[in-house]
């Protein structure tokens, strides 16, 4: 099953997350099919905090990809920001 989920990046105590499309059997930070955005929870500016390619999200959702709970909330939030 293909999932849209967060992959952690950044340094210790300074998280940075990539929004990736991956097979559900792969590890959290492992192999991915496509990187479709990022989320920086430390950033204060809303425009720099989250960036999502909504066209690619729609494409993957139409092909049956399942978003994680957190990614689902971020996608809804990004539609309101942009």
From Swiss-Prot:
MF (Gene Ontology): structural constituent of ribosome
Which SUPFAM superfamilies does this entry report, sorted A to Z?
Answer: Ribosomal protein S16
**Keyword check for Ribonucleoprotein:** yes
Where does the UniProt annotation place the signal sequence? none
What keywords appear on the UniProt entry?
Ribonucleoprotein, Ribosomal protein
Question: What PANTHER family does the record tag this protein with?
Answer: 30S RIBOSOMAL PROTEIN S16, SMALL RIBOSOMAL SUBUNIT PROTEIN BS16M
Output the NCBIfam families linked to this UniProt entry: S16 (TIGR00002)
So what family is this one in? Belongs to the bacterial ribosomal protein bS16 family.
State the name under which the record lists this protein.
Small ribosomal subunit protein bS16
Q: Which organism is it from?
A: Blochmanniella floridana
């Amino acid at each position: 099953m293909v999932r849209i989920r967060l992959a952690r990046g950044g340094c210790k105590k300074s998280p940075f997350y990539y929004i990736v499309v991956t097979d559900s059997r792969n590890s959290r930070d492992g192999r991915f099919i496509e990187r479709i955005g990022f989320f920086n929870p430390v950033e204060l500016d809303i425009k720099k905090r989250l960036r999502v390619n909504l066209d690619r999200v729609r494409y993957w959702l139409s092909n049956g990809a399942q978003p994680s709970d957190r990614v689902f909330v971020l996608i809804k939030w990004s539609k309101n920001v942009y």
